[in-house]
Amino acid sequence: MGVAAVCRSFGSDASSNLIPLRISFFFKNASISFRSLFSSVNSSSWFKRDTQYSSVSFLSLSSIKSSALGNLLLSLLWSSLSDAELGTAELGREDIFEAETVLLIMMSLNNLYILSVRRLTPTGNSRPLKISRLQQVRKNPYPF
């Protein structure tokens, strides 16, 4: 199973000491729900807010820091994507990323938050996200 990751620096929030990270995975010929990967983690800290454009959920995952996936997530940095960049992936064909494969990760000294973003159509139905750029991970310790 081939995996490509999008990563660019996203910036930091000095007022709250949070370092926002955003990560997206593309699984060739496969689909995966990141939420299901973390189903065993305590999700009591979920809270949700809706905007005109997206539905956003936060989950505090203190145990992810010690996991292999957590180490992989922490090794990736990337910047925000504008609406104009949510287009066709540059892979020679159109590659659509499911909503739950697009994550925003906000990390502080004591907590790690995963932000799952789902874009909504004008009728309120969710639709897949499209990512326009794929970049090589600078130092990927998991060559799969």
UniProtKB/Swiss-Prot annotation:
Disruption phenotype: Deletion leads to overproduction and excretion of inositol into the growth medium. It comes from the Eukaryota. Partially overlaps VID21. Disruption phenotypes caused by deletion of this gene may also be a result of a defect in its overlapping gene. This is Putative uncharacterized protein OPI7.
